[in-house]
A protein has these predicted regions:
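Intrinsically disordered, low-complexity regulatory regions enriched in serine/threonine/proline
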Residues: 2-12, 28-259
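Short secondary-structure junctions
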Residues: 20-29
Length: 259
């Protein structure tokens, strides 16, 4: 076997059964990318990793929660630098543990069978100890909306480049809590009207198309809509648009490096 195959076997053997126990029974592979999917009411959770054939390096990706309706609608909108659909990308992304990050860096420095084994063991621990809490956090739209309203800026939670994250967020609000959407549109209007923040006019055109289409999509259910939730986003007073945009760009840059 090649070094990549040796590392992959040693890495995967530690947690293959754990994924099955936790419901990640659907498997998909595209080239060097391996993804395991678990369905929930509004979409599916994704756990994935990449095994680089040339070097033997294995990189674990943070878990993802894909809201299928959101992702389907987003695919219908054309916008600049649109990435090809990926089986490993969802609407929201979790975080890996500090121990996993350390072992990931060790693997990157020395992609050996030993480092693959240690990373596989820590991946098993992560699945057993952390994955369920991630699923609970991102399985109910109403709970997500409530959490978003306490954040410094709601779009920070969504995957993608800063403008794409806002697109995802607006679609999600339309489906999950449309009564809160006007406030989010007011904020996003300010972003896309600013040439300092969004230089490409193509984004403004795509944004107008999205705004026109948003009312066509009906909410998931009034049961998950946060009708009684009135705490406003702190975005208005605590943070400047420029500071938020810089943060989102940095966040997206880190995500791209991890792919």
């Amino acid at each position: 076997m090649s070094r990549c195959e040796d590392n992959l076997v040693e890495f995967y053997r530690f947690f293959s059964q754990a994924l099955i126990r936790h419901g990640y029974t659907a498997k998909k592979r595209v080239g060097e990318l391996f993804a395991f999917l678990k369905p929930f009411e509004y979409g599916h959770f994704i756990f994935s990793f990449i095994a680089y054939e040339a070097t033997g390096l294995i990189r674990v990706r943070p878990p993802q929660a894909s809201f299928d309706a959101v992702e389907k609608i987003l695919q219908e909108i054309d916008y600049p630098d649109k990435l090809q659909f990926s089986i490993s990308l969802g609407t929201f992304m979790g975080e890996l543990s500090e121990d996993m990050d350390k072992l990931q860096k060790r693997m990157e420095a020395s992609p050996t069978v030993e480092s693959a084994s240690l990373l596989g063991l820590e991946t098993f621990r992560y699945i057993e100890q952390k994955l369920e809490s991630f699923e609970e956090e991102y399985s109910i739209p109403g709970n997500i909306i409530e959490e978003l309203e306490y954040r410094d800026f709601w779009a920070m939670a969504f995957n993608g480049s800063p403008p794409e994250a806002m697109f995802r967020g607006l679609i999600f609000y339309q489906l999950a809590s449309p009564e809160l959407l006007p406030d989010k549109l007011h904020q996003s209007d300010r972003v896309f009207e600013s040439r300092e923040l969004v230089a490409d006019d193509a984004w403004r055109i795509s944004y107008q198309v999205l705004k026109e289409k948003l009312p066509r999509w009906k909410a998931y259910s009034t049961d998950v809509s946060a009708h009684s939730f009135t705490v406003p986003s702190r975005f208005h007073s605590a943070f400047s648009l420029k500071a938020i945009w810089a943060y989102l760009k940095k966040l997206y840059s880190n995500e791209v490096k991890a792919i």
